[in-house]
């Protein structure tokens, strides 16, 4: 019922009546294929998975009349669902591990007897507020160097690991490594601070930074930092 659009005619005249009837398939299939919007962040990182995302398939653009649910597998594909040949509306109900929920509502035209595929992507969760290191004099606990010493030029080695670890089970090799140095910066009230952070202005050497939306970010994982070169006089 509902899978076919049916109709017919009855012809009457002299003698026997004739009937002509027809049935036209009125359903098609909908499916979804999902990817990461930033594979440089997610590839090889077990904190991210495109499996388990759920999407609702709706008859109306306000998404109040749900027809079916689609769930992604480890390759980002879903099974097909049969729906009436028409435009359906699809939105994400729950995001997979490590991703933000996509709040967009997508339309998909389904034709009778055919399979329509919606291609979508999710944005990985990242830390976009980067950590800042402030260098101070240990004895005075202030950001003023003593004598002819300097707090600028201290070098810190940052190591990022694509996974959640503690100090006892860190892998032997980091996924990416960076070396940065402290730079003197003066704030609005005239106070000078000696700062290092993961940005090109502070970078001495190392891998490229992870980028998203034009900014350096950190993917989900573990970060360690260690001072590997003291500034002059320390």
Language model features with spans:
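Solvent-exposed loop/turn and edge beta-strand elements of beta-rich ligand-binding domains
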Residues: 1-234
């Amino acid at each position: 019922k509902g899978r076919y659009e049916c109709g017919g005619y009855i012809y009457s005249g002299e003698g026997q009546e004739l009937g002509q009837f027809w049935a036209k398939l009125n359903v098609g299939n909908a499916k979804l294929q999902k990817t990461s919007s930033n594979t440089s962040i997610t590839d090889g990182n077990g904190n991210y998975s495109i499996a388990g995302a759920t999407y609702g398939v709706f008859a109306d653009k306000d998404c109040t009349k749900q027809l079916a649910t689609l769930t992604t597998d480890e390759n980002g594909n879903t099974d097909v669902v049969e729906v009436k040949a028409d435009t359906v509306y699809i939105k994400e109900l729950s995001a997979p591990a490590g991703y933000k929920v996509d709040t967009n509502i997508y339309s998909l035209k389904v034709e009778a007897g055919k399979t329509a595929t919606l291609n979508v992507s999710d944005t990985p969760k990242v830390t976009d507020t980067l950590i800042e290191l402030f260098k101070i004099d240990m004895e005075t606990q202030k950001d003023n160097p003593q004598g002819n010493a300097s707090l600028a030029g201290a070098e810190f080695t940052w190591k990022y690991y694509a996974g959640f670890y503690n100090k006892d089970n860190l892998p032997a090799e980091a996924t990416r490594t960076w070396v940065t140095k402290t730079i003197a910066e003066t704030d609005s009230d005239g106070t000078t601070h000696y700062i290092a952070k993961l940005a090109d202005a502070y970078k001495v050497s190392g891998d490229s930074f992870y980028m998203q939306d034009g900014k350096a970010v950190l993917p989900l994982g573990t970060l360690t930092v260690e001072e590997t070169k003291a500034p002059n006089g320390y």
